Amino acid sequence: MWIFYFPAVISVLIVSLYFYFTRTFNYWKKRNVRGPEPTVFFGNLKDSALPRKNMGVVMEELYNMFPEEKVIGIYRMTSPCLLVRDLEVIKHIMIKDFEVFSDRGVEFSKEGLGSNLFHADGETWRALRNRFTPIFTSGKPKNMFYLMHEGADNFIDHVSAECEKNQEFEVHSLLQTYTMSTIAACAFGISYDSIGDKVKALDIVDKIISEPSYAIELDMMYPGLLSKLNLSIFPTAVKNFFKSLVDNIVAQRNGKPSGRNDFMDLILELRQLGEVTSNKYGSSASSLEITDEVICAQAFVFYIAGYETSATTMAYMIYQLALSPDIQNKLIAEVDEVLKANDGKVTYDTVKEMKYMNKAFDETLRMYSIVEPLQRKATRDYKIPGTDVVIEKDTIVLISPRGIHYDPKYYDNPKQFNPDRFDAEEVGKRHPCAYLPFGLGQRNCIGMRFGRLQSLLCITKILSKFRIEPSKNTDRNLQVEPHRGLIGPKGGIRVNVVPRKLVS
């Protein structure tokens, strides 16, 4: 008899699932917030979830759908989220009313690598920030410059040797060898002479991290579930690798600074100071002991921030220089002039003083903002100034730097590579929130000084020896890799790297 009821049971199940996965889809309509129609199971992130498109590209497309709206109501699977377009509203969220949006809202187990400065929220983040932010102030990367310089020289020697065999390179993976070795030296004190095996190990870690993460997809579908189940988004193999690496370094240095002035030295100096405390907000202070686990988590995020983002940004800059010979000529002239004035040496100060180089780097970051989208979580109900829209507590707020950076309201001909956009006069005309490659406010990218320095040093060294030219395999219409969390080139970037003495 049951067979006669089977179709009815299936029908009820399908209808129940439909209503379950669409139960929130009137949330924004009830609040008179416009947005695209969501689809069952996926909300507005179908292309990202499958994955057919990178999350940053999806957010840019959503941004462009409603050009007259200040905010757009969207759904991350079934969860209502708010995509903010208006720059003044962004300024309130990131700066003026930061205490309401101080959390990123990335919820998973904070054990192990989860207690890092990027992902931590609440009092844990404040405690970490109070103690660890000084590590990334301008003076600290300057002290590491000698390590970066040694790495850049080794990298140029490697490229020169490879050029004798073949002048065409896939520059994204090529530049990863530079940033990985530099991070290994600046973060973990691994000398360039003994770097081979460690870099191979870090390369394996990168491949594990870059694989599609089902944990992240699960968090998108059911926000907060990973935290409730005490699950991490980081594979156990990655956690074990960094724990072993940090344990060995701490043991080699007897738990004390070694005098190298690298990242581990700075953290060991902080550990000698005792607990990390936070009392910026509220009347009660919280504390966090700097354990080996906390050190491991910060070492991990330093590696992630300095390795992939810098390599990708440099690869995109190299790509644009290959397609823009006039701009490349100006940069080479500036590099030659600086080297001539400094006896052929590249110093910390000369890197910062090269105005056109810095403008070209800023323009690269405008066109290719690597971390997309920016995310915050409301810690209480918040009424958006100048509107009737109330962001309820725990709502995720998203910002699309890519959408803003390609908005013709803020940048003429936004698809054109034009470093002159960053003349001081032009920058002064723009809203401060029209440029967000590093985020903004207290939760901006604290590693931006380090990343910028190692990138500009490397590009300077490259242009002092080589010209960049399109190869027969250079893709004139680069696509974004859909499977990685960061913005990156699908299929890599192929160009010719030609020794300048061979250029007619």
From Swiss-Prot:
One of its GO terms (molecular function) is heme binding. Its cofactor is heme. This is Cytochrome P450 6B6. GO terms for cellular component: endoplasmic reticulum membrane. PANTHER family: CYTOCHROME P450 (PTHR24292), CYTOCHROME P450 6A16, ISOFORM B-RELATED (PTHR24292:SF100). Its EC number is 1.14.14.1. Belongs to the cytochrome P450 family. It comes from the Eukaryota. Keywords: Endoplasmic reticulum, Heme, Iron, Membrane, Metal-binding, Microsome, Monooxygenase, Oxidoreductase. The gene is CYP6B6. It is found in: Endoplasmic reticulum membrane; Microsome membrane. Pfam families: p450. It is a peripheral membrane protein.
